């Protein structure tokens, strides 16, 4: 009905409600005869159909009908309920109802409205049959359209038009006080009915399509027809809520359907059969999902909303594959579906026999039985001899064109395929079955069941039927076997590899169909899972070497190496490299670690390849058994004294591995990451790193990726989501394996534990049981580490954050007090507080933590230990590895002297026997030269000291450049005068004989500290020393050399410290040491900051 006619009827019907006579009567005296009046009612009972309105309106204008008004109301109500949702029928109904309303106004319309509204009340009893439910929904859809049309033309307006309130349906009586628009109340009642089943979604979509102006604010064409001014807004709000619920339900059903498909697929592969419970549930969910999906698309397009993704697999399962830019590129052999074009045509292009089949079935005539029997025998003879594509295709056509198709022939064909023993003809027989599969489905189904049962009997018995396996493989290539049946066979063969012949069956099956399954897109994903299962099974310790070799051959069969890869030369490993690989990764727990250290020290360290292998072995702890990580650390600690730079490189690489693990955050690398943090912990336990390095690593693990390096429960860190507890496992692995707690570690441990506790609370609660146990064990281990103060755990996030804040404030207060005492607050903070309190506190006052934690400062240690005598040399921190080796030093020296005669500089920590018989005059010259070299080594003449002297010279040149011209000239002049005085002193003493008694002695001793280079050992002064003993000048040992001919003799002179010569030497040595330390700090700071 067009808008003009609607407005015309609306005007007439509104005037009728106001009591005006608007219906045109043919005559003033109406026909009151029974025949005429009952005839009108009979016409009404026929229903409102196209063409009936003119006859009914004519009778309505001529017949009296007053006495039959109640019967007319009942008849019209029944007719309205049965109006079909057709445009012409609805228009006819609107015209007739409008005419009746204009003729009788409220007397007719008021009871009609009450009776018609009963049709929209939802049934109180559930309708069991879905068919009946759909019929009811279709009827309600037509009734709603008729009601809306009558509402727009002004016939039905509001509940106030109903005179008897008892006639109002129950669902409207509850809401009479709310004064909602009548059409809105009806729609709300209809759309809420069994929403989860989606029956009413079709009503919603049909309504918005038919009455679109009711939902558009920019369309005012029907504003004059709407009785309630709030109707538009109410309908828009109602449908907005309905759309949100529809989208959510459609997405939920989409995930359920996909999940059900995946579970069914897994169940099929596991059992090899269709499961009725999955099929029934799927068949039940699919129609509901289709209803919601269709409704969501329609509503989304109408209201211009973003429609959720409901096609194909769920978003979580989508895997995008990059398509190649070159469409005609030649794939490598292992990625080709078929070996060549002829093979592709054989399996993919089947002959079209549809016309032959239709002719055979439509014009089949009775033939002579003898002739028919001859034809059948000839057909089977030719079938037995068929060996190529053309012949088998011709036989497919002959079968139908010769009218051979009947039940007996089909059974004979099935028996023929079961009994044939010629393996070479199985591909053409499979092609025959594939060509006729559409017309003989029962033969295909029976033959597949035969192959399936035969296959099942082989899986668990000591039998093998190669013919059936090959036939099964050929049927796979023609895609006649269901995918679940294929992968059930493969999976079962892999899982029960110990059953005799299963590996042979799997080899035959994959030899004939493996590449097809691997490269066919429909099977590729499942086949890759099967290949991974084979690779995992290959690592099963229960399998013998023959089984593992067979599985390796299957993988090679599926992924054959290219000719290019076969020609590539394999990297060869030297026997020495192979020896150290086996020693560290296989035999680490079989030998004493001291022996392993000796073997590693004897490696050819000058060979770069050997160094690379050893570096890889000591920097990849995940490649050894987890229980052997402490042993690996022991060996590394044993090397520290001899290969310090190498050990530092290994530790740096472990720290880099931990950093890399945080950046990549790959689930598959979790065990690697655990191994690395355990290795770092053991390195700390063996005193090769300071506690600051370990603490910084723990903080870095916790804070990595968080905003401002601070974990916050209100901001999502994608690399560390709230439901990922792996970082907690890393931290607890470190803390639970710490075996020593130096003072510097204990000092900062409380803040670390409090911060770690806060971090655990920002995770989703409750924690998993295993994680909770590890956290509890960690806090229990450290609860008594702080002396009398016991660490108390918090109950929740708020309490933990409060305690952490209080601890930070107290530490900041102590830090500020110390800075004021030192007078350096301004230089450290620049008048501001640190932006990150935890960082500022954990990194605060490094100078105060220069103590070695009873361990080793790898970067800032003094060089004194390096240039100490060989007899007293030991690794910094005196770790266990060095102590265990001390008893074997003498035995080692003989071997090492033989190995290292040509390279003394590489002997970083080796010790030799020292000859104590210095005054033996009968020694030859070689022995004396050896003694001299040992003496030089004892007093610092090693490479490290030379390097320090060179660094001192470079630093002096650097300072010299900073001075102006006048200062440099003054220093040069002073140096020349000093050299001149020294030369004069030497010339004057050439002929002078030195007598100890003539050495001048100063009355008061000069208090000068003795340098480490010149003193061997010094016992602490006793508290019982007398004043005279304390006042005596201390003496320094000097070696006095005399040469007589070729023989050189030496003797020790004890010179007092108050002699000017001695004091000058002491001051020079002290100055040299101080400058050396300054240079070292500058260089190290520049290198490692």
UniProtKB/Swiss-Prot annotation:
Residues 819-951 are annotated as: Disordered. This is Nonsense-mediated mRNA decay protein 2. It comes from Saccharomyces cerevisiae (strain ATCC 204508 / S288c) (Baker's yeast). Pfam families: MIF4G, Upf2. One of its GO terms (biological process) is nuclear-transcribed mRNA catabolic process, 3'-5' exonucleolytic nonsense-mediated decay. The keyword Cytoplasm applies. It is found in: Cytoplasm. Involved in nonsense-mediated decay of mRNAs containing premature stop codons. It interacts, via its C-terminus, with NAM7/UPF1. Could be involved in determining the efficiency of translational termination or reinitiation or factors involved in the initial assembly of an initiation- and termination-competent mRNP. Gene3D superfamilies: 1.25.40.180. One of its GO terms (molecular function) is RNA binding. GO terms for cellular component: cytoplasm; exon-exon junction complex. InterPro entries: ARM-type_fold, MIF4G-like_typ-3, Nmd2/UPF2, Upf2/Nmd2_C. Residues 841-866, 885-943 have a biased composition (Acidic residues). Keywords: Cytoplasm. Present with 1280 molecules/cell in log phase SD medium.
């Amino acid at each position: 009905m067009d808008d003009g006619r609607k407005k015309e009827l609306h005007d007439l019907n509104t005037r009728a409600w106001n009591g005006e006579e608007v219906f045109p009567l043919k005559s003033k005296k109406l026909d009151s005869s029974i025949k005429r009046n009952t005839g009108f009612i009979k016409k009404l009972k026929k229903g409102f159909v196209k063409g009936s309105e003119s006859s009914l309106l004519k009778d309505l204008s001529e017949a009296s009908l007053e006495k039959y008004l109640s019967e007319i109301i009942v008849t019209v109500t029944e007719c309205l309920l049965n109006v079909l949702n057709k445009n012409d029928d609805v228009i006819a109904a609107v015209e007739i109802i409008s005419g009746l309303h204009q003729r009788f106004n409220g007397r007719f319309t008021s009871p009609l409205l009450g009776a018609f509204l009963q049709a929209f009340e939802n049934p109180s009893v559930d309708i069991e049959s879905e068919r009946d439910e759909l019929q009811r929904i279709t009827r309600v859809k037509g009734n709603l359209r008729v009601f809306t049309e009558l509402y727009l033309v002004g016939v039905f307006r509001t509940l106030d038009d109903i005179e008897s309130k008892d006639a109002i349906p129950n669902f409207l009586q509850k809401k009479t006080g709310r004064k909602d628009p009548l059409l809105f109340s009806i729609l709300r009642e209809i759309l809420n009915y069994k929403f989860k089943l989606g029956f009413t979604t079709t009503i919603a979509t049909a309504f918005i399509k038919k009455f679109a102006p009711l939902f558009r604010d920019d369309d005012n064409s029907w504003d004059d027809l709407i009785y309630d001014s709030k109707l538009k807004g109410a309908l828009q709000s109602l449908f907005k809520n309905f759309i949100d619920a529809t989208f959510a339900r459609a997405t939920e059903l989409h995930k359920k359907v996909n999940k059900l498909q995946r579970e069914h697929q897994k169940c099929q592969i596991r059992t090899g059969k269709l499961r009725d419970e999955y099929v029934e549930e799927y068949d039940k969910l699919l129609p509901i999902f289709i209803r919601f999906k269709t409704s969501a698309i329609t509503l989304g397009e109408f209201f211009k909303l973003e429609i959720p993704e409901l096609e194909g697999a769920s978003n979580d399962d989508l895997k995008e594959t990059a398509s190649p830019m070159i469409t005609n590129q030649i794939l490598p052999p292992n990625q080709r579906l078929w070996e060549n074009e002829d093979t592709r045509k054989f399996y993919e292009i089947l002959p079209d026999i549809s016309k032959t089949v239709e002719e055979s079935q439509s014009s089949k005539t009775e033939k002579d039985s003898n002739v028919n029997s001859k034809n059948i025998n000839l057909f089977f003879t030719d079938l037995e001899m068929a060996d190529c594509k053309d012949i088998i295709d011709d036989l497919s056509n002959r079968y139908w064109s010769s009218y051979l198709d009947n039940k007996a022939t089909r059974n004979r064909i099935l028996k023929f395929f079961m009994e044939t023993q010629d393996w070479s003809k199985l591909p053409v027989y499979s092609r025959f079955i594939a060509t006729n599969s559409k017309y003989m489905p029962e033969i295909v189904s029976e033959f597949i069941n035969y192959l399936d049962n035969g296959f099942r009997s082989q899986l668990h018995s000591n039998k093998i039927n190669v013919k059936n396996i090959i036939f099964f493989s050929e049927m796979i290539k023609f895609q006649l076997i269901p995918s679940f049946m294929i992968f059930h066979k493969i999976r079962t063969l892999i899982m029960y590899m110990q059953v005799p012949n299963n590996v042979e069956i799997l080899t035959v099956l994959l030899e004939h169909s493996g590449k097809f399954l691997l490269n066919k897109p429909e099977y590729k994903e499942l086949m890759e899972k099967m290949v991974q299962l084979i690779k995992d099974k290959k690592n099963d310790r229960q399998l013998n070497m023959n089984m593992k070799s067979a599985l390796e051959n299957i993988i090679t069969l599926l992924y054959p190496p290219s000719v290019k890869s076969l020609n590539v030369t394999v990297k060869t490993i030297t026997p020495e490299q192979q020896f150290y690989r086996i020693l560290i990764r296989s035999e680490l727990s079989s030998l004493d670690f001291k022996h392993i250290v000796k073997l590693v020290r004897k490696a050819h360290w000058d060979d770069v390849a050997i160094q690379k292998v050893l570096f890889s072995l000591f920097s990849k702890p995940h490649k050894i058994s987890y229980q052997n990580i402490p042993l690996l650390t022991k060996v590394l600690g044993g090397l520290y004294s001899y290969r310090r730079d190498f050990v530092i490189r290994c530790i740096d690489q472990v720290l880099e591995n931990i950093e890399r693990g945080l950046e990549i955050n790959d689930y598959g690398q979790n065990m690697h990451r655990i191994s690395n943090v355990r290795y770092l912990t053991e390195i700390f336990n063996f005193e090769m790193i300071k506690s600051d390095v370990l603490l910084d690593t723990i903080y870095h693990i916790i804070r990595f990726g968080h905003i401002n390096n601070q974990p916050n429960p209100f901001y999502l860190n994608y690399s560390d989501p709230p439901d990922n507890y792996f970082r907690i496992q890393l931290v607890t692995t470190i803390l639970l394996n710490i075996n020593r707690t130096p003072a510097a570690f204990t000092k900062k441990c409380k803040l670390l534990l409090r911060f770690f506790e806060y971090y655990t609370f920002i995770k989703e609660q409750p924690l998993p049981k295993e994680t909770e146990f590890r956290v509890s064990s960690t806090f229990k281990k450290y609860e008594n580490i702080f002396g009398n103060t016991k660490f108390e755990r918090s109950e929740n996030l708020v309490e933990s954050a409060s305690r952490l804040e209080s601890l930070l404030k107290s530490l900041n207060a102590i830090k500020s007090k110390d800075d004021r005492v030192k007078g350096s607050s301004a230089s450290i903070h620049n008048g501001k507080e640190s932006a990150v309190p935890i960082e500022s506190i954990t990194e605060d006052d490094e100078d105060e933590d220069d103590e070695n934690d009873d361990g080793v400062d790898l970067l800032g240690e003094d060089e004194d230990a390096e240039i100490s005598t060989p007899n007293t040399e030991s690794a910094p921190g005196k770790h266990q590895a060095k102590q265990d080796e001390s008893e074997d030093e003498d035995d080692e020296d003989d071997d090492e002297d033989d190995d290292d005669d040509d390279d003394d500089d590489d002997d970083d920590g080796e010790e030799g026997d020292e000859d104590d018989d210095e005054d033996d005059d009968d020694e030859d010259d070689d022995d004396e030269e050896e003694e001299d070299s040992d003496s030089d080594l004892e007093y610092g003449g090693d490479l490290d000291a030379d390097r320090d002297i060179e660094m001192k010279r470079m630093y002096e040149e650097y300072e010299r450049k900073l001075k102006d011209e006048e200062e440099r000239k003054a220093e040069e002049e002073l140096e020349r005068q000093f050299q001149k005085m020294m030369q004069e002193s030497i010339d004057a003493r050439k002929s002078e004989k030195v007598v100890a008694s003539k050495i001048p002695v100063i009355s008061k001793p000069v208090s000068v500290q003795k340098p480490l280079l010149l003193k061997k050992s010094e016992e602490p002064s006793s508290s019982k020393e007398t004043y005279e003993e304390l006042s005596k000048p201390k003496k320094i040992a000097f070696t006095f050399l005399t040469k007589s001919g070729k023989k050189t003799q030496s003797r020790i002179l004890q010179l007092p410290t108050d002699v000017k010569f001695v004091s000058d030497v002491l001051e020079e040595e002290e100055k040299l040491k101080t400058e050396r330390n300054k240079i070292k700090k500058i260089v190290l700071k520049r290198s490692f900051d």
